[in-house]
Amino acid sequence: MKKLIFTLMAAAMTASSTAQSVDTESLSAYDQNVPIGWATIGEGVTGSNDENPVTVETREALIAALAGTTPKTIYVKGTILFTGLVSINGAQNKTVYGLPGAVLANPDHSTIKAESGILQLKNCKNIILRNLTFKGAGAYDMDGSDNLELQASTYIWVDHCDFQDGVDGNLDCNNGSDNICISWCRFHYLIAPWSGGSGGSNDHRYTNLWGGGDKNAAKDEGKLRTTFANCWWDEGCKERMPRIRFGQVHLLNCLYSSSVANYCVGGGYRSNAYIEKCAFTSNAAKKYPWKNYATSGTFNDYNYTITSCLGATDKQTRYGSIDYFIPSEKYSYESYDAALVQSVVSNSSNGAGATLKFTDPTAIQESASVADIVKVEYFSLDGSRLTMPRKGIAMQVVTKADGTKLTRKITLSK
Protein backbone atom coordinates (compact mmCIF):
# COMPACT_ATOMS: atom_id res chain seq x y z
CA MET A 1 0.00 0.00 0.00
CA LYS A 2 1.31 3.38 -0.98
CA LYS A 3 1.98 5.98 1.65
CA LEU A 4 2.04 9.77 1.29
CA ILE A 5 5.01 11.30 3.10
CA PHE A 6 4.55 15.06 3.47
CA THR A 7 7.77 17.03 3.45
CA LEU A 8 5.99 20.13 4.82
CA MET A 9 7.18 22.50 2.12
CA ALA A 10 3.78 24.10 1.76
CA ALA A 11 1.95 27.38 1.39
CA ALA A 12 -1.65 28.47 1.42
CA MET A 13 -2.45 29.89 -2.01
CA THR A 14 -5.56 30.69 -4.00
CA ALA A 15 -6.06 31.07 -7.75
CA SER A 16 -8.42 34.01 -7.92
CA SER A 17 -6.20 36.92 -8.98
CA THR A 18 -2.92 37.94 -10.55
CA ALA A 19 -1.56 39.24 -7.24
CA GLN A 20 -2.55 36.57 -4.73
CA SER A 21 0.97 35.93 -3.42
CA VAL A 22 1.87 39.57 -2.84
CA ASP A 23 1.93 40.94 0.70
CA THR A 24 -0.43 43.83 0.01
CA GLU A 25 0.04 45.35 3.47
CA SER A 26 3.61 46.30 2.55
CA LEU A 27 2.75 48.04 -0.74
CA SER A 28 2.93 51.77 -1.32
CA ALA A 29 -0.37 53.56 -0.92
CA TYR A 30 -0.02 54.47 -4.61
CA ASP A 31 0.65 50.92 -5.79
CA GLN A 32 -2.51 49.52 -7.39
CA ASN A 33 -1.03 46.01 -7.60
CA VAL A 34 -2.60 45.43 -11.02
CA PRO A 35 -1.62 46.20 -14.61
CA ILE A 36 -2.83 49.60 -15.78
CA GLY A 37 -3.09 51.61 -18.97
CA TRP A 38 -2.55 49.96 -22.33
CA ALA A 39 -2.33 46.49 -20.76
CA THR A 40 -5.99 46.77 -19.73
CA ILE A 41 -7.36 47.42 -23.22
CA GLY A 42 -9.13 44.50 -24.91
CA GLU A 43 -8.25 41.11 -23.46
CA GLY A 44 -6.14 42.49 -20.63
CA VAL A 45 -3.35 40.74 -18.75
CA THR A 46 -4.15 37.92 -16.33
CA GLY A 47 -1.03 35.77 -16.57
CA SER A 48 -1.59 32.39 -14.94
CA ASN A 49 -4.32 33.57 -12.56
CA ASP A 50 -1.96 32.05 -9.97
CA GLU A 51 -2.74 28.53 -11.13
CA ASN A 52 -0.35 25.55 -11.21
CA PRO A 53 2.48 26.80 -8.98
CA VAL A 54 6.06 25.66 -9.48
CA THR A 55 9.34 26.87 -7.97
CA VAL A 56 12.46 27.01 -10.16
CA GLU A 57 16.09 27.43 -9.18
CA THR A 58 17.88 26.67 -12.47
CA ARG A 59 17.88 28.11 -15.99
CA GLU A 60 16.69 24.81 -17.43
CA ALA A 61 13.76 24.63 -15.02
CA LEU A 62 12.77 28.22 -15.79
CA ILE A 63 12.82 27.59 -19.55
CA ALA A 64 10.72 24.44 -19.15
CA ALA A 65 8.21 26.19 -16.91
CA LEU A 66 7.76 29.08 -19.34
CA ALA A 67 7.11 26.84 -22.34
CA GLY A 68 3.65 26.30 -23.80
CA THR A 69 0.26 27.87 -23.21
CA THR A 70 -0.94 26.07 -20.07
CA PRO A 71 -1.37 28.55 -17.19
CA LYS A 72 1.55 28.30 -14.81
CA THR A 73 2.75 30.31 -11.81
CA ILE A 74 6.53 30.27 -11.63
CA TYR A 75 8.41 31.26 -8.48
CA VAL A 76 12.08 32.05 -9.09
CA LYS A 77 14.32 31.32 -6.13
CA GLY A 78 17.95 32.38 -5.78
CA THR A 79 20.27 33.41 -8.59
CA ILE A 80 19.92 31.85 -12.05
CA LEU A 81 22.92 32.31 -14.33
CA PHE A 82 22.78 32.84 -18.09
CA THR A 83 25.58 32.63 -20.66
CA GLY A 84 23.65 34.31 -23.48
CA LEU A 85 20.16 35.34 -24.51
CA VAL A 86 17.46 32.72 -23.92
CA SER A 87 14.50 33.14 -26.27
CA ILE A 88 11.07 31.97 -25.12
CA ASN A 89 8.88 31.59 -28.21
CA GLY A 90 5.09 31.35 -28.13
CA ALA A 91 4.57 31.16 -24.37
CA GLN A 92 1.19 32.22 -22.99
CA ASN A 93 -0.61 32.53 -19.66
CA LYS A 94 2.39 32.63 -17.34
CA THR A 95 3.09 34.59 -14.16
CA VAL A 96 6.68 34.73 -12.94
CA TYR A 97 7.31 35.91 -9.39
CA GLY A 98 10.82 36.55 -8.15
CA LEU A 99 10.99 35.54 -4.52
CA PRO A 100 12.97 38.01 -2.38
CA GLY A 101 16.54 38.10 -3.66
CA ALA A 102 15.76 36.34 -6.95
CA VAL A 103 18.20 37.30 -9.71
CA LEU A 104 18.54 36.48 -13.41
CA ALA A 105 22.16 37.27 -14.24
CA ASN A 106 24.64 37.17 -17.10
CA PRO A 107 27.60 38.73 -15.30
CA ASP A 108 30.56 37.92 -17.55
CA HIS A 109 31.69 40.60 -20.01
CA SER A 110 32.24 39.26 -23.51
CA THR A 111 32.96 40.75 -26.93
CA ILE A 112 30.87 37.97 -28.53
CA LYS A 113 27.28 39.04 -29.27
CA ALA A 114 25.82 35.58 -28.66
CA GLU A 115 27.13 35.66 -25.10
CA SER A 116 25.18 38.81 -24.17
CA GLY A 117 21.64 39.24 -22.92
CA ILE A 118 19.40 37.32 -20.55
CA LEU A 119 15.77 36.76 -21.58
CA GLN A 120 13.69 37.34 -24.71
CA LEU A 121 9.92 36.95 -24.96
CA LYS A 122 9.07 36.32 -28.62
CA ASN A 123 5.53 35.81 -29.96
CA CYS A 124 4.37 35.54 -26.37
CA LYS A 125 1.03 36.61 -24.94
CA ASN A 126 -0.45 37.25 -21.50
CA ILE A 127 2.78 37.15 -19.50
CA ILE A 128 3.46 38.72 -16.10
CA LEU A 129 6.96 39.24 -14.69
CA ARG A 130 7.21 40.59 -11.14
CA ASN A 131 9.91 41.23 -8.57
CA LEU A 132 12.84 39.97 -10.64
CA THR A 133 16.31 41.51 -10.68
CA PHE A 134 18.10 41.38 -14.03
CA LYS A 135 21.88 41.83 -13.89
CA GLY A 136 23.92 42.26 -17.06
CA ALA A 137 27.67 42.51 -17.58
CA GLY A 138 27.77 46.25 -18.25
CA ALA A 139 26.98 48.40 -21.27
CA TYR A 140 29.01 47.56 -24.40
CA ASP A 141 28.20 48.82 -27.89
CA MET A 142 28.39 45.78 -30.20
CA ASP A 143 24.72 45.41 -31.21
CA GLY A 144 24.37 42.73 -28.55
CA SER A 145 21.34 41.65 -26.56
CA ASP A 146 19.40 43.14 -23.68
CA ASN A 147 18.56 42.07 -20.16
CA LEU A 148 14.96 41.64 -21.29
CA GLU A 149 13.60 41.87 -24.83
CA LEU A 150 9.96 41.96 -25.91
CA GLN A 151 9.60 40.81 -29.52
CA ALA A 152 6.19 40.51 -31.22
CA SER A 153 4.61 39.91 -27.81
CA THR A 154 1.28 41.23 -26.53
CA TYR A 155 -0.41 41.79 -23.19
CA ILE A 156 2.74 41.91 -21.10
CA TRP A 157 3.00 43.28 -17.55
CA VAL A 158 6.48 43.85 -16.09
CA ASP A 159 6.17 45.04 -12.50
CA HIS A 160 8.60 45.78 -9.68
CA CYS A 161 11.63 44.52 -11.59
CA ASP A 162 15.16 45.87 -11.21
CA PHE A 163 17.24 46.18 -14.39
CA GLN A 164 20.98 46.64 -14.03
CA ASP A 165 23.86 46.98 -16.49
CA GLY A 166 22.31 45.68 -19.69
CA VAL A 167 24.87 45.13 -22.44
CA ASP A 168 22.85 46.65 -25.29
CA GLY A 169 19.87 47.81 -23.25
CA ASN A 170 18.08 47.05 -20.02
CA LEU A 171 14.60 46.45 -21.45
CA ASP A 172 13.82 46.87 -25.16
CA CYS A 173 10.61 46.37 -27.12
CA ASN A 174 9.95 46.08 -30.84
CA ASN A 175 8.58 44.10 -33.81
CA GLY A 176 4.90 44.68 -33.14
CA SER A 177 4.77 44.14 -29.38
CA ASP A 178 1.67 45.79 -27.96
CA ASN A 179 -0.58 46.36 -24.93
CA ILE A 180 2.22 46.62 -22.42
CA CYS A 181 2.49 47.94 -18.87
CA ILE A 182 5.86 48.57 -17.25
CA SER A 183 5.24 49.59 -13.65
CA TRP A 184 7.39 50.22 -10.59
CA CYS A 185 10.59 49.17 -12.41
CA ARG A 186 14.04 50.56 -11.73
CA PHE A 187 16.74 51.01 -14.37
CA HIS A 188 20.34 51.77 -13.46
CA TYR A 189 24.00 51.04 -14.15
CA LEU A 190 26.45 50.02 -11.45
CA ILE A 191 29.28 48.86 -13.74
CA ALA A 192 31.37 51.36 -15.69
CA PRO A 193 30.61 51.13 -19.42
CA TRP A 194 32.94 49.05 -21.57
CA SER A 195 34.65 50.91 -24.42
CA GLY A 196 35.89 49.70 -27.79
CA GLY A 197 32.77 47.98 -29.07
CA SER A 198 32.09 47.63 -32.79
CA GLY A 199 29.13 50.02 -32.55
CA GLY A 200 31.43 52.97 -31.89
CA SER A 201 30.09 54.32 -28.60
CA ASN A 202 32.33 54.10 -25.55
CA ASP A 203 29.38 54.72 -23.25
CA HIS A 204 26.34 52.73 -24.36
CA ARG A 205 24.25 53.05 -21.21
CA TYR A 206 21.14 53.40 -23.38
CA THR A 207 18.48 51.78 -21.29
CA ASN A 208 15.17 51.32 -23.21
CA LEU A 209 14.65 51.27 -26.98
CA TRP A 210 10.98 51.20 -27.98
CA GLY A 211 10.90 50.46 -31.72
CA GLY A 212 14.03 49.27 -33.45
CA GLY A 213 13.99 51.04 -36.82
CA ASP A 214 12.37 53.82 -38.84
CA LYS A 215 11.62 51.39 -41.69
CA ASN A 216 9.79 48.85 -39.52
CA ALA A 217 6.35 50.43 -39.99
CA ALA A 218 4.85 47.20 -41.34
CA LYS A 219 5.27 45.64 -37.90
CA ASP A 220 5.29 48.61 -35.52
CA GLU A 221 2.75 51.08 -36.92
CA GLY A 222 -0.20 51.16 -34.51
CA LYS A 223 1.66 48.91 -32.04
CA LEU A 224 4.19 49.38 -29.22
CA ARG A 225 1.43 50.95 -27.11
CA THR A 226 2.87 51.09 -23.62
CA THR A 227 2.21 52.60 -20.21
CA PHE A 228 5.23 53.25 -17.97
CA ALA A 229 4.05 54.05 -14.44
CA ASN A 230 6.07 54.74 -11.29
CA CYS A 231 9.33 53.75 -12.97
CA TRP A 232 12.73 55.07 -11.96
CA TRP A 233 15.61 55.88 -14.29
CA ASP A 234 18.33 56.03 -11.69
CA GLU A 235 22.08 56.69 -11.69
CA GLY A 236 24.07 55.71 -14.76
CA CYS A 237 21.26 55.95 -17.30
CA LYS A 238 22.64 57.92 -20.23
CA GLU A 239 19.91 57.90 -22.89
CA ARG A 240 16.71 56.14 -24.06
CA MET A 241 14.42 56.44 -21.04
CA PRO A 242 12.83 55.33 -23.34
CA ARG A 243 13.58 56.24 -26.98
CA ILE A 244 10.37 55.74 -28.95
CA ARG A 245 9.41 54.99 -32.53
CA PHE A 246 5.79 54.52 -33.67
CA GLY A 247 4.32 53.78 -30.25
CA GLN A 248 1.79 55.72 -28.22
CA VAL A 249 3.67 55.75 -24.92
CA HIS A 250 2.36 57.12 -21.63
CA LEU A 251 4.93 57.98 -18.96
CA LEU A 252 3.13 58.53 -15.66
CA ASN A 253 4.59 59.43 -12.25
CA CYS A 254 8.09 58.35 -13.29
CA LEU A 255 11.35 59.53 -11.73
CA TYR A 256 14.43 60.70 -13.64
CA SER A 257 17.45 61.20 -11.38
CA SER A 258 20.52 60.17 -13.38
CA SER A 259 23.32 62.73 -13.14
CA VAL A 260 24.82 61.59 -16.46
CA ALA A 261 21.71 61.79 -18.63
CA ASN A 262 22.28 63.23 -22.11
CA TYR A 263 18.50 63.28 -22.43
CA CYS A 264 15.60 61.38 -20.89
CA VAL A 265 12.70 60.60 -23.24
CA GLY A 266 13.68 60.39 -26.91
CA GLY A 267 11.20 60.91 -29.72
CA GLY A 268 11.85 59.08 -32.99
CA TYR A 269 9.86 58.54 -36.16
CA ARG A 270 6.07 58.59 -35.61
CA SER A 271 6.51 58.51 -31.84
CA ASN A 272 3.65 59.83 -29.73
CA ALA A 273 4.60 60.37 -26.09
CA TYR A 274 2.57 61.73 -23.19
CA ILE A 275 4.79 62.58 -20.21
CA GLU A 276 2.59 63.24 -17.19
CA LYS A 277 3.33 64.14 -13.57
CA CYS A 278 6.89 62.87 -13.78
CA ALA A 279 9.80 64.23 -11.73
CA PHE A 280 13.07 65.29 -13.35
CA THR A 281 15.29 65.83 -10.33
CA SER A 282 18.93 65.84 -11.49
CA ASN A 283 20.42 68.83 -13.28
CA ALA A 284 21.07 66.66 -16.33
CA ALA A 285 17.50 65.38 -16.44
CA LYS A 286 16.08 68.88 -16.03
CA LYS A 287 18.22 70.14 -18.91
CA TYR A 288 16.95 67.62 -21.44
CA PRO A 289 13.74 65.91 -20.30
CA TRP A 290 12.93 65.36 -23.98
CA LYS A 291 14.94 65.13 -27.19
CA ASN A 292 13.67 64.82 -30.74
CA TYR A 293 15.42 61.92 -32.44
CA ALA A 294 13.32 62.07 -35.61
CA THR A 295 15.56 61.52 -38.59
CA SER A 296 15.83 63.63 -41.73
CA GLY A 297 13.97 63.19 -44.99
CA THR A 298 10.63 61.40 -44.77
CA PHE A 299 11.20 59.97 -41.27
CA ASN A 300 10.39 63.06 -39.26
CA ASP A 301 6.87 62.75 -37.80
CA TYR A 302 6.67 62.93 -34.01
CA ASN A 303 4.41 64.16 -31.21
CA TYR A 304 5.01 64.77 -27.56
CA THR A 305 3.20 66.29 -24.61
CA ILE A 306 4.77 67.20 -21.27
CA THR A 307 2.26 68.11 -18.59
CA SER A 308 2.24 68.73 -14.83
CA CYS A 309 5.80 67.51 -14.34
CA LEU A 310 8.41 68.58 -11.79
CA GLY A 311 11.59 69.96 -13.36
CA ALA A 312 10.13 70.28 -16.87
CA THR A 313 7.94 72.95 -18.42
CA ASP A 314 4.57 72.02 -19.88
CA LYS A 315 4.88 71.71 -23.63
CA GLN A 316 3.11 70.15 -26.59
CA THR A 317 4.93 69.85 -29.90
CA ARG A 318 4.54 67.89 -33.10
CA TYR A 319 5.95 67.62 -36.57
CA GLY A 320 3.63 66.14 -39.17
CA SER A 321 -0.06 65.33 -39.13
CA ILE A 322 -0.38 62.65 -36.44
CA ASP A 323 -3.02 63.39 -33.81
CA TYR A 324 -1.77 63.93 -30.29
CA PHE A 325 -2.00 60.87 -28.04
CA ILE A 326 -4.13 61.69 -24.99
CA PRO A 327 -4.20 58.70 -22.58
CA SER A 328 -7.46 59.71 -20.88
CA GLU A 329 -9.19 59.22 -24.24
CA LYS A 330 -7.97 55.61 -24.34
CA TYR A 331 -8.28 54.35 -20.76
CA SER A 332 -8.96 55.49 -17.21
CA TYR A 333 -6.18 55.74 -14.65
CA GLU A 334 -5.15 57.26 -11.33
CA SER A 335 -2.16 59.50 -10.68
CA TYR A 336 -0.63 61.69 -7.97
CA ASP A 337 1.17 65.02 -7.87
CA ALA A 338 4.66 65.17 -9.37
CA ALA A 339 5.98 66.70 -6.14
CA LEU A 340 5.47 63.31 -4.46
CA VAL A 341 7.13 61.19 -7.13
CA GLN A 342 10.68 61.24 -5.79
CA SER A 343 9.72 60.14 -2.28
CA VAL A 344 7.22 57.52 -3.49
CA VAL A 345 9.18 55.95 -6.32
CA SER A 346 12.61 55.95 -4.64
CA ASN A 347 11.32 54.47 -1.37
CA SER A 348 13.63 51.55 -0.60
CA SER A 349 10.88 49.59 1.16
CA ASN A 350 8.11 49.67 -1.42
CA GLY A 351 9.16 51.91 -4.28
CA ALA A 352 10.43 50.99 -7.74
CA GLY A 353 12.54 47.88 -8.14
CA ALA A 354 12.29 44.38 -6.71
CA THR A 355 10.72 45.49 -3.44
CA LEU A 356 7.68 43.20 -3.27
CA LYS A 357 7.21 40.86 -0.34
CA PHE A 358 5.87 37.35 -0.99
CA THR A 359 4.82 34.20 0.73
CA ASP A 360 7.38 31.60 -0.35
CA PRO A 361 5.39 28.63 -1.72
CA THR A 362 8.09 26.24 -0.48
CA ALA A 363 8.16 27.56 3.08
CA ILE A 364 6.67 25.64 5.97
CA GLN A 365 3.25 27.06 6.65
CA GLU A 366 0.09 25.66 8.22
CA SER A 367 -3.40 26.26 6.89
CA ALA A 368 -5.63 28.22 9.27
CA SER A 369 -8.77 26.86 7.60
CA VAL A 370 -10.78 24.15 9.40
CA ALA A 371 -13.26 23.70 6.54
CA ASP A 372 -13.87 20.30 4.96
CA ILE A 373 -11.70 19.16 2.08
CA VAL A 374 -13.68 19.07 -1.18
CA LYS A 375 -10.97 18.29 -3.75
CA VAL A 376 -7.41 16.99 -3.93
CA GLU A 377 -5.32 17.46 -7.09
CA TYR A 378 -1.77 16.50 -8.02
CA PHE A 379 0.75 18.28 -10.24
CA SER A 380 4.24 17.45 -11.43
CA LEU A 381 7.02 19.83 -10.44
CA ASP A 382 6.80 21.54 -13.84
CA GLY A 383 3.16 22.40 -13.12
CA SER A 384 1.46 19.74 -15.29
CA ARG A 385 -1.70 18.21 -13.83
CA LEU A 386 -1.51 14.49 -12.96
CA THR A 387 -4.56 12.25 -13.31
CA MET A 388 -3.38 10.28 -10.29
CA PRO A 389 -0.43 10.44 -7.91
CA ARG A 390 2.62 8.40 -8.86
CA LYS A 391 5.89 7.48 -7.24
CA GLY A 392 8.23 10.40 -6.75
CA ILE A 393 7.99 14.07 -5.82
CA ALA A 394 4.85 16.00 -6.78
CA MET A 395 2.72 18.95 -5.68
CA GLN A 396 -0.59 18.27 -3.97
CA VAL A 397 -3.25 20.99 -4.03
CA VAL A 398 -6.01 20.60 -1.47
CA THR A 399 -9.17 22.67 -1.94
CA LYS A 400 -11.39 23.27 1.07
CA ALA A 401 -15.07 24.14 1.22
CA ASP A 402 -14.36 27.77 2.08
CA GLY A 403 -12.20 28.20 -1.03
CA THR A 404 -8.85 27.88 0.75
CA LYS A 405 -6.15 26.11 -1.25
CA LEU A 406 -3.21 24.41 0.46
CA THR A 407 -0.29 23.40 -1.72
CA ARG A 408 2.13 20.79 -0.44
CA LYS A 409 5.26 19.29 -1.90
CA ILE A 410 4.97 15.55 -1.31
CA THR A 411 6.94 12.37 -1.82
CA LEU A 412 4.98 9.27 -2.81
CA SER A 413 6.58 5.94 -1.95
CA LYS A 414 5.62 2.34 -1.23
Please annotate each region the language model reported:
Residues 81-220:
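Right-handed parallel beta-helix
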Residues 74, 96-98, 127-130, 156-159, ...:
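All-beta strand scaffolds that present successive hydrophobic residues in beta-strands
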Residues 88, 103, 190-192, 201-276:
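Long, polar low-complexity repeats
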Residues 360-385:
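Residue-level detector of functionally pivotal "anchor" positions at catalytic/ligand-binding pockets or at interdomain
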Residues 395-414:
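C-terminal tail/sorting-segment detector
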Residues 390-394:
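A glycine-anchored, Pro-Gly-centered beta-turn/N-cap motif
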Residues 2-12, 17-72, 83, 308-361:
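Extracellular "leader-to-stem" segments immediately downstream of a signal peptide or signal-anchor
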Residues 243-360:
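Extracellular beta-rich repeat passengers
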